[in-house]
UniProtKB/Swiss-Prot annotation:
The keyword Cytoplasm applies. It is found in: Cytoplasm. It comes from Pseudomonas sp. (strain M1). This is Glutathione S-transferase. It catalyses: RX + glutathione = an S-substituted glutathione + a halide anion + H(+). Conjugation of reduced glutathione to a wide number of exogenous and endogenous hydrophobic electrophiles. Its EC number is 2.5.1.18. Monomer and homodimer.
Length: 15
């Protein structure tokens, strides 16, 4: 679950 959140967080930060 943490991995999924981290992935989404990175995507948001990139955007």
């Amino acid at each position: 679950m943490l991995l999924v959140i981290g992935s989404k967080n990175l995507s948001s930060t990139n955007m």
